[in-house]
Amino acid sequence: MSAVIPRIEQLSARVVRVLGCNPGPMTLQGTNTYLVGTGRRRVLIDAGERAVPEYIVSLREALKQHDTSIQHIIVTHWHHDHTGGVQDILAHFNTDAELRVSKLPRCPPQEEIIGDDKKKYSYLNDGDVIQTEGATLRVLFTPGHTDDHMALLLEEEQAVFSGDCILGEGTAVFEDLHDYMKSLQKLLSIKADLIYPGHGPVVHDAGSKIHEYIIHRNAREQQILNVLLENSGTAFTSSELVKVVYKETPEHLHRAAEFNLLHHLRKLLKDGKICLAEGSDEKKWKSNL
């Protein structure tokens, strides 16, 4: 168990973390939101969940402590523990009417609304640069966790705000394993010094953590394949496989684990290493080797 994350903490000369006050099995101690820059107006990365008054209190306190206001809100992806608080921030703070709230578009494109739909997202592109006093942020399209996921490179620190692509502890869930693995390789190529994750503590050895994620996913794929190879005459449902492959994982996390396992199975199916068993009312997989 990692150390308790304070509600507000200055992590560097240009980064202040404000905890989202929304702890849970998937959010760990809560969503990390970050005030970035050194001036009287700063960028807020991620906005926590909707209707969490404790977060609004913490954000107000952080802005007061650093004598600053919000210039621009950037959300790393569409999940509600990162976008939900936008509406509350707009409602509780005397923000500029022109305040931009930005993200990457969904793929395929779909309509996205903020609260009562009076404000629209401003869409960014891979490689875009956002500047504020004391900080330069470069957009990195990193799909996999979601189709619209971005990380942000803080150029002055060679640090990455990783959203939910990489967590401070444990491993991440994803929607598309192929895209996710490509995104990990992309982040590895950045050669960042540290990672400011969407959940959990700061990662100080970025390269090692990213390597760890890549190795873990490859090992998990091999583990799934080994179970099917060792039981070559048997077909398994995904829920049956979870109990074997994730036997060391707490049971309350098995649903999230099954989500990841299904993506591994789809990849293995595409690779021709496994096949779907015939004659069953539910999907069952078996080795094709």
Curated annotation (Swiss-Prot):
Domain of life, source organism: Eukaryota
Enzyme class name: hydrolase
Organism: Danio rerio (Zebrafish)
Pfam family, one: BLACT_WH
Protein name: Endoribonuclease LACTB2
GO molecular function list: RNA endonuclease activity; single-stranded RNA binding; zinc ion binding
Keyword Transport attached: no
InterPro entries: LACTB2-like_MBL-fold, LACTB2_WH, Metallo-B-lactamas, RibonucZ/Hydroxyglut_hydro, Sec-metab_biosynth-thioest, WH-like_DNA-bd_sf
Family: Belongs to the metallo-beta-lactamase superfamily. Glyoxalase II family.
EC number(s) from the headed UniProt entry: 3.1.27.-
UniProt-annotated binding residues for Zn(2+) 1: 77, 79, 145, 164
Cited Gene3D superfamilies: Ribonuclease Z/Hydroxyacylglutathione hydrolase-like, Winged helix-like DNA-binding domain superfamily/Winged helix DNA-binding domain
Compartments, record wording: Mitochondrion matrix
Cofactor(s) demanded: Zn(2+)
Function: Endoribonuclease; cleaves preferentially 3' to purine-pyrimidine dinucleotide motifs in single-stranded RNA. The cleavage product contains a free 3' -OH group. Has no activity with double-stranded RNA or DNA. Required for normal mitochondrial function and cell viability.
Residues at which Zn(2+) 2 binds: 81-82, 164, 199
GO cellular component assignments: mitochondrial matrix
Cofactor, free-text remark: Binds 2 Zn(2+) ions per subunit.
Keywords for this protein: Endonuclease, Hydrolase, Metal-binding, Mitochondrion, Nuclease, RNA-binding, Zinc
Main location, first listed in the record: mitochondrion
